[in-house]
Design a protein with these regions (language model features):
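Short helix-terminating capping/connector loops at secondary-structure junctions
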Residues: 2-6, 57-59, 84, 111-112
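Conserved active-site and cofactor/substrate-binding residues in soluble primary-metabolism enzymes
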Residues: 17, 41-49, 72, 95, ...
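Rossmann-fold NAD(P) dinucleotide-binding segment
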Residues: 16-63, 76-80
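Conserved N-terminal Rossmann-fold NAD(P) cofactor-binding segment
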Residues: 1-19
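Short, solvent-exposed loop/turn segments at secondary-structure junctions
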Residues: 31, 72, 163-165
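Long, compositionally biased stretches enriched for glycine and/or charged residues
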Residues: 105, 109-192
Length: 192
């Protein structure tokens, strides 16, 4: 009752022909102790077929990639599809930035939506926190280096903790993808 009607069905690639946005989440699951980069060979092989099949039926949509390693697979999908770079997008560090803001907010006792802070770079083990620009409504966070490192380590390791606890991540990335789609369809011009 809160989200309206949702229709779910099993289909095939021809169902993508009129899609404005095609979200790809397919791939091998990350196992406990496995890095996102460890998934590259398996998921690159899976993606080769997926991208080929999608581009056979759709040449106008936007590809939104969530499968890890997301940055590399977004790049290879762009190259393989032959589509403009502006139409092949990865989920990037949006989820990392959301986790980062949540942990900062938890530390400061402030709603994470009021925290301005970003994780940049590659999604995963080499991501970078931008502490120099992190603030609450323009006010410095005043976090010591030890607290900053703890928050960043917890941000970076959140997915591994979830994978160890329940085997996979799903809900948070789904919310991140929903946010990206809303920004695209609403032509928001948002920095996510």
């Amino acid at each position: 009752p809160f989200t309206g009607g949702v229709k779910v069905w099993a289909g095939d690639y021809s169902d993508c022909k009129d899609a404005d946005i095609i979200i790809i989440t397919a791939g091998a699951s990350q196992k406990p102790g496995e890095t996102r980069i460890d998934l590259l060979k398996k998921n690159a092989s899976i993606f080769k077929d997926i991208i080929e099949r999608i581009t056979e039926v759709n040449s106008h949509g936007i590809l939104l990639i969530a499968t890890n390693p997301v940055d590399i697979l977004s790049y290879t999908s762009w190259k393989q599809s032959g589509w403009p770079a502006s139409r092949v997008i990865g989920s990037g560090t949006l989820l990392d930035s959301a986790r980062f803001r949540y942990l900062i907010g938890k530390n400061k006792g402030i709603d994470p939506r009021s925290i301005h802070a970003h994780i940049i770079g590659e999604h995963g083990d080499s991501e970078v926190p931008v502490w120099s620009l992190a603030n609450v409504a323009g006010t410095d966070l005043e976090l010591d280096e030890e607290t900053q490192q703890d928050i960043f380590d917890r941000t970076k390791n959140a997915a591994y903790e979830i994978i160890n606890a329940k085997g996979a991540t799903s809900y948070a990335i789904a919310l991140a993808l929903d946010r990206i789609v809303a920004a695209i369809l609403g032509n928001e011009g948002s920095v996510l």
